[in-house]
């Protein structure tokens, strides 16, 4: 019950309102507010009132303008970048090493046999077109060639370039097509790409035949390797005990067993040291060469795949623990026959994230499915870009590219199942829209670690020590008394911290909420002499104004409803006799005849009779003497 009474009281208070008029509220506010200016408006003479009103209005506008500037600056989410230096014992970076050739030619020769013969015939046509004979191409398998052939574009007449088939019609007839040859100065090699039905064809031009041949060979090799099982591809690569000859971390010996294998399609079998997936990351005791990682690698250059790997050396990359190594984009080469020393400096990048920076903390707010999540690695923008491209490949070409992970239920592209995949892939790769779409959807990681490298090289081994070093390494790996290694196939690496000083580049908000409140309060106090309480007072008067306005509107609506006019009486006014009869007609019978002479019959008289209600008998109208009423009251009391 007390709660009900309290609620009813509150309801009545709301319905009643503040109890003031607009003018009374304004006068009360000007008399009681702590803001400078309003009190002078009502206390001074007419001229000063006008002057103080204009000054108060002007300064109020200045305060609102300054507030708008500060709020806009705060909502721009600007950041300030600070650089700090630190010194501490740091974890040694993860080191990924690969061979430039993804496979051993001796193990993939049976897969590339037809492609190798076709490639030799292509080079013969490019280098010596007039000396080539028909019988040299009669044994070639043109199944691969017909999907994506190389052509010659004769540009001796720039206004009318002529496209020539590199082999003419020699694989279909005994006579070559006329005019199907031209010299190297007048022709350029291009790749012809056609859709499945052959109605749409484009040409990918190159400035050099070397680029055209290499690109075409990699495209055809991708078609072949995409149809091989992953475990078979791993077996065709370089084994860890064949590529890693010696390992030393600080003063502790290590071997290929301390490396985690991973298959990278561009470089085959790669091996990661100190990845930190199953073991704790190794710290570096001190800066300097003696406390880093020393490796001797055998790249086996004599077993490289022709045309697929034109660079001899080791490919390596330094990265943070539990991150996927994107060696093709971020790796470096170490040349064979040299000792490469890599000094490392550490930079830590720490971003604020949304809304200050367009970065992500863990990739959970990125709309792209991370195809590298199966490796249990952290998010990176390269993983997002590759996943985005693979998603576009599947959507546009109905298959995935061999170089990137494949979503569940999808298949890799190949000429047998997807005849026009090369046309679709290269069109998508050259699409600016695709790149911009992926760049807009992917975000940089807010927290990143970058390793700045200083690289120096020297010949290794020297001529004086080459013989005994190669003998020892051959004995350790092959148990052979003869030299089984070559200087052209070995690489020595020294990776170490130059110093333990590290830099932290950190973002911080340039304008935080404390900055905003202090500036808002400073401007309000400077121009108006007010505080937060003054704003509360102003808010109170605004609420009262709204309250009064609502009550007035409600009352006005109710008054309109009450004053709504009723339908007017259409008949003539009744006479005195009719009124008397109405009061004495206790049966409420309608009149059938009129008492007036020359009475006219109105149609509404029968339908709208005057009610005959007798006057009420009120006890209060009974007049009695005062003493009689008092006696009656006494009797009732008794």
From Swiss-Prot:
- Which residue spans belong to the Extracellular compartment? 72-530
Keyword field: Cell membrane, Cytoplasmic vesicle, Disulfide bond, Glycoprotein, Ion channel, Ion transport, Membrane, Phosphoprotein, Sodium, Sodium channel, Sodium transport, Transmembrane, Transmembrane helix, Transport, Ubl conjugation
* Outcome after substituting residue 621 to A: Decreased interaction with NEDD4. Decreased inhibition by NEDD4 and NEDD4L
Q: Name one GO biological process term.
A: sensory perception of salty taste
GO MF term (any one)? ligand-gated sodium channel activity
Family, per entry: Belongs to the amiloride-sensitive sodium channel (TC 1.A.6) family. SCNN1B subfamily.
Q: What is this protein called?
A: Epithelial sodium channel subunit beta
Q: Which gene encodes it?
A: Scnn1b
